[in-house]
Swiss-Prot record:
It comes from Christiangramia forsetii (strain DSM 17595 / CGMCC 1.15422 / KT0803) (Gramella forsetii). It holds the Pfam family Ribosomal_S10. GO terms for molecular function: structural constituent of ribosome; tRNA binding. The keyword Nucleotide-binding does not apply. This is Small ribosomal subunit protein uS10. Belongs to the universal ribosomal protein uS10 family. The lineage of its organism: Bacteria, Pseudomonadati, Bacteroidota, Flavobacteriia, Flavobacteriales.
Length: 101
């Protein structure tokens, strides 16, 4: 086959993303394919500002932050063995995986 596979991982917890990327790298290396990465992509931060009081005190506000972490993996010289190993791989439920062939 020998095609390039690009895997993007996204999660709100950076530990989950790192562990998932490490798991994928170990699995792919056992099949004999070449892996580049994990490459950390920029962190997206969303900040929400909310009034603390429902009625008065406009000056009193509270801010909440939601950060999403991303990693990028490229797999070269993959075989059918590599693809089968990736399909059978169990990843945590908080990680979004996007695969492009």
């Amino acid at each position: 086959m020998s095609q390039k596979i690009r895997i993007k991982l996204k999660s709100y917890d950076h530990n989950l993303v790192d562990k998932s990327a490490e798991k994928i790298v170990k699995t792919v290396k056992t099949t004999g394919a070449v892996v580049t990465g994990p490459i950390p992509l920029p962190t997206n931060k969303k900040i929400f500002t909310v009034l603390r009081s429902p009625h008065v005190n406009k000056k009193s506000r509270e801010q909440f932050e939601l950060s999403s972490y991303k990693r990028l993996l490229d797999i070269y010289s993959s075989s059918s063995k590599t693809i089968d190993a990736l399909m059978k791989l169990e990843l945590p439920s908080g990680v979004e995986v996007e695969i492009k062939v």
